[in-house]
């Protein structure tokens, strides 16, 4: 089913809306937990939903390698395979291919690489990505693109962006040929170069997509460059389509993305950091394995309503972490996922109440940090 995007309110550049799918409605701005292999690590779908998650991200590349398209089709699709009946967005595999480094070769046709699981030679292109994502039953399908690395010269970024545009057209054509009833998002590339981002936006909007992602950021560039590119790119994207910042990020990155007009985010950070004992709280980050928490009987965050904070102390979580108990990783993950969803809920409420700038100021004040200036404020 084609999603319906309703833009309900704006507060500066911050946007408040909703994505309406057959499988449910997603309030935006929204954060999507990452379920790489068809699971948010260590969590049942019910637990993920209880944290406030409305939509998940699945990984086309990894699910293609394991368990494969045939096993997926035996179950119906990814929703049935993992028992998550809400909306799912799948990335196209482009970023994972980018991450393979020396074991892949990119050509105009697609990408030749060795299967990191068993070493077999395999090939992925725009058409194959569209076919896999249709079999996954993705509510939002991402085009196959090349993630421009950082650093890249202007010429390198230009060639990469232009190839991604050609792949975008192939993705659109094959998506339509497959008669996929769901939704296809384009991905803006161009590295840190504003003129290349302009060309990418123009090319993608001429092809036409159901939503637009900003890709190729959070790959090593300075934060100032990410903010500058977002601030330049977002106003050029169609007002009536959702905007998705891929692979981002820290809580501060989500706030800065919303300040610049982003509606959707995803990142492994809350789950990965949870497993490493880095826990997000109102004032910043707690490293739970530090000795200072051994005798601290207070919860992680007095403002948090998650299962972990309602039932366990920092001392207990420290103990579980030091003993490498699986429960520790699970409780940490529940907390971090809930923190991210509470952050998005607070952002949505602030936009609804026309006080988003005040929210941003308070968010940074709790971290003893200055609010990063917008480009227009620097002029």
From Swiss-Prot:
Gene Ontology cellular component terms for the protein in this record: cytosol
Region (RNA binding): 247-253, 271-275
UniProt catalytic activity: 7-aminomethyl-7-carbaguanine + guanosine(34) in tRNA = 7-aminomethyl-7-carbaguanosine(34) in tRNA + guanine
Keywords: Glycosyltransferase, Metal-binding, Queuosine biosynthesis, Transferase, tRNA processing, Zinc
GO MF annotation terms: metal ion binding; tRNA-guanosine(34) queuine transglycosylase activity
Record carries keyword tRNA processing: yes
Annotated family: Belongs to the queuine tRNA-ribosyltransferase family.
Record's protein name: Queuine tRNA-ribosyltransferase
Species this protein is from: Vibrio cholerae serotype O1 (strain ATCC 39541 / Classical Ogawa 395 / O395)
Species lineage: Bacteria, Pseudomonadati, Pseudomonadota, Gammaproteobacteria, Vibrionales
Gene name of the encoded protein: tgt
